[in-house]
């Protein structure tokens, strides 16, 4: 499979994986053929990279949790040591015109996701006193925001669910909002604090505007697997790109451009279904059965999206 060869070359020559405390993480891999492979562990990033070159999976995931024995298949035997606090903002979950209209990587939809990520970061820092330590472009239609701090590692599912409810303004009542914030912070930090309440100043007349659209399942799950920063997204061929918080002040086109892994050469793609649109800055129009010569990153994207097949 030609795409697999490109993935292998990326992991051999270009990949810059960013996973801290590798030896305490469970890794999981989705191969190009076959089912998910889980409960893998590695001593360091170099050992992980050698595995990626040898096996070349389509997707690479790692646990937000740290374990004493990450290789154990029985979750009870892994020895849970705490979990990063991770928030997933996905264009698939945003009810905006741009995200509803497009299922490919759309710059307009990504702008909406970026704005939601900035909103989340404001709430975390200004209202809850949490400092995001890592932001990752997912390589598809969203962003992952990581908080890695001693005070959040030990939070259980209940506390994380309370935090999600706060972010999504579940049960919002303006007359009781100060009390609600206080209760949430008592649950999370065992101290009384009200926070800056930026969202009240911005949107008190519209409770819907107070919500931050995060995927609650990702944040609540203390054993969650999430895409490894620096790995390739097997749906697009783009890099799951580590970013700084300041990168979210830039246009998303700049972020997507940086995430393109395959910048050299062209590939021929035989279309198995019609397509018309813009793919990674390239306008493409084809009927079923057409053969087009396209930039490598565009052809790989379209094959991974099952619009056609690359051939020699």
Swiss-Prot record:
The active site is at 88, 90, 215. It comes from the Archaea. GO terms for biological process: DNA replication, synthesis of primer. The keyword Transmembrane helix does not apply. Keywords: DNA replication, DNA-directed RNA polymerase, Magnesium, Manganese, Metal-binding, Nucleotidyltransferase, Primosome, Transcription, Transferase. One of its GO terms (cellular component) is DNA-directed RNA polymerase complex. SUPFAM superfamilies: Prim-pol domain. GO terms for molecular function: DNA-directed RNA polymerase activity; metal ion binding. Its cofactor is Mg(2+); Mn(2+). It holds the Pfam family DNA_primase_S. InterPro entries: DNA_primase_S, DNA_primase_ssu_euk/arc, DNA_primase_ssu_PriS. Its EC number is 2.7.7.-. The keyword Transmembrane helix does not apply. It is an enzyme of class 2 (transferase). Belongs to the eukaryotic-type primase small subunit family. Heterodimer of a small subunit (PriS) and a large subunit (PriL). Catalytic subunit of DNA primase, an RNA polymerase that catalyzes the synthesis of short RNA molecules used as primers for DNA polymerase during DNA replication. The small subunit contains the primase catalytic core and has DNA synthesis activity on its own. Binding to the large subunit stabilizes and modulates the activity, increasing the rate of DNA synthesis while decreasing the length of the DNA fragments, and conferring RNA synthesis capability. The DNA polymerase activity may enable DNA primase to also catalyze primer extension after primer synthesis. May also play a role in DNA repair. This is DNA primase small subunit PriS. The lineage of its organism: Archaea, Thermoproteota, Thermoprotei, Thermoproteales, Thermoproteaceae.
């Amino acid at each position: 499979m030609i795409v697999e060869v490109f993935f292998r070359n990326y992991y051999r020559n270009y990949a810059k994986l960013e996973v801290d405390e590798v030896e305490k993480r469970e890794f999981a891999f989705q191969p190009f053929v076959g089912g998910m492979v889980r409960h893998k562990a590695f001593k360091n990033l170099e050992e992980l990279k050698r595995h990626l070159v040898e096996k070349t999976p389509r997707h690479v995931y790692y646990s937000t949790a740290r374990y004493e024995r990450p290789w154990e298949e029985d979750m009870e035997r892994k020895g849970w040591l705490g979990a990063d606090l991770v928030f997933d903002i996905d264009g698939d979950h945003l009810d905006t015109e741009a995200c509803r209209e497009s299922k490919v990587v759309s710059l307009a939809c990504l702008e909406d996701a970026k704005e939601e990520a900035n909103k989340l970061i404001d709430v975390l820092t200004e209202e809850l006193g949490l400092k995001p330590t890592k932001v990752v472009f997912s390589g598809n239609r969203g962003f992952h925001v990581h908080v890695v701090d001693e005070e959040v590692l030990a939070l259980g599912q209940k506390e994380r669910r309370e935090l999600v409810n706060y972010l999504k303004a579940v049960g919002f009542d303006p007359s009781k909002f100060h009390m609600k914030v206080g209760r949430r912070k008592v649950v999370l930090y065992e101290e009384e604090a009200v926070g800056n309440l930026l969202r009240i100043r911005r949107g008190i007349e519209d409770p819907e505007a107070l919500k931050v659209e995060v995927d609650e399942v990702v944040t609540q799950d203390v054993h969650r697997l999430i895409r490894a920063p620096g790995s390739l997204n097997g749906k697009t061929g783009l890099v799951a790109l580590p970013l700084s918080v300041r990168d979210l002040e830039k246009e998303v086109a700049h972020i997507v451009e940086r995430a393109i892994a395959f910048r050299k050469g062209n590939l021929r793609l035989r279309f198995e279904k019609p397509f018309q649109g813009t793919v990674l800055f390239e306008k493409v129009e084809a009927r079923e059965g057409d053969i087009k010569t396209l930039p490598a990153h565009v052809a790989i994207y379209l094959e991974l999206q099952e619009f056609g097949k690359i051939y020699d």
